């Protein structure tokens, strides 16, 4: 699924793929937020994904293949809509280049498992570091929220001009506080 000997299109929407017309195509899915609470950030994150694969394709692609990300779907940072978009892409793509949001990606994890679909969430949830939790399907990038917090504490202890004796932690429910 999602891999063909036919060449990738020259562009997806208005974004060029940089695909080599003599190579086959690997299609990747993308589930974003264009109109929900991350609507201001989602398109920039998508641009980063598309730019990476444009670069990869112009550098030779992956073996005998170029890579194209299909048109992104607007999940509005809503888990049910996220699943709806995943269902619309699952038969067309080899993997998800981007799945925006921790609760959203967790909501579709069982479906990813059924399809043996690898995903790269735009989320830094610490649970993805455990293969028995993420079923070995999540490709992490960047430091997790937990590691970022520990790094901040290490920096503060080493860099601030005061002797830190106590540290308070305030947690919130949701994406970040549950980590």
Please state what every model-predicted region is.
Residues 3-4, 8-25, 29-50, 72-79, ...:
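Extracytoplasmic "Venus flytrap"
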Residues 21-23, 62, 162-164:
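Short, flexible coil/linker segments at domain boundaries that flank nucleotide/cofactor-interacting
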Residues 42-43, 82-83, 109:
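Conserved strand-to-helix beginnings and helix N-cap segments that scaffold or border functional pockets
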Residues 9, 65-90, 148-151:
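Structural motif
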